[in-house]
Amino acid sequence: MGGVGIWRIRYNTGMSQAASAITRSPAEIVQINPVSQAPNGICYARSGEVTIAENDLDRMIAAVPGAIASALTRKAYYFVPLTVSQGDETVIADRYDVVLSDSAVCHRNLNIGDAQCVFISTRLMDDKFSIAFEFYINVGHALVERAGVSAAFADLAWQQVEASVRGETSLDAWEARKLATAHGPDAEKYKNEYLAASFADAISIYLLSLYLDVDYYDLRERDYPLLAPAPMAERLRKIAEIFPVNPGFEFNIYYRRRG
């Protein structure tokens, strides 16, 4: 991916040149920012004014178990300040810009050359929890797309559905579960969508828990009820069985006493 080029630098109009963020095309970002490869095989790079510390980013990547990372071949992750959607075009800002942030997206997957490059906006979130969760959600969905859903996990999750456990792990899983249990003509299709979504969700939450101490209540969203603690713990333990932790990481579930 190396080489020397002349970059077309664009300035965000509407702000003074001194205060404007510089934007570049994703292909330019790929060419001027060589990737590092973590011990688990994941390729990644940072570009621009990214506030997450380098050692935190390295550990975030290293938390992904080798069995998951091995499914992410020909994929590279770029942690950038802002990934900005400009109609059909995507540009990358070299730092936070309040005007550009209005059209920024959390991430964008783009095929560049023979690899899929994922550009993750770090300055829309600016805290380790949110940045890591965005990365791990992408990893979870990429694994499901390439390797499918574990039969052992699917059996567990569907047993929980049949037992009418409360809540789910994402809006996608919640909506698909409702359709899968409505006994309509497309119930089987929605069941498969539900299992794919819930498996990806469980992977992302598991990875987040390897990197940070995660409180159950930090996972709540307003759009759907969160899966109850006991079935959540069952799913995460199943993921830990399927994808054991890398050396230097631990997976534990602790229960706090109330009162």
Predicted regions and their residues:
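Post-HEXXH active-site segment of zinc metalloproteases
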Residues: 129-133, 145-181, 216-224
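Short glycine-rich, low-complexity/disordered patches
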Residues: 70-80, 149-150, 173-174, 252-254
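Short pre-active-site segment immediately N-terminal to the catalytic Zn-binding motif
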Residues: 118-136, 188-191
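Auxiliary, metal-adjacent structural segments of Zn-dependent hydrolase domains
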Residues: 37-128
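Active-site-flanking alpha-helical
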Residues: 140-148, 204
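Pan-zinc metallopeptidase signature
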Residues: 2-34, 186-259
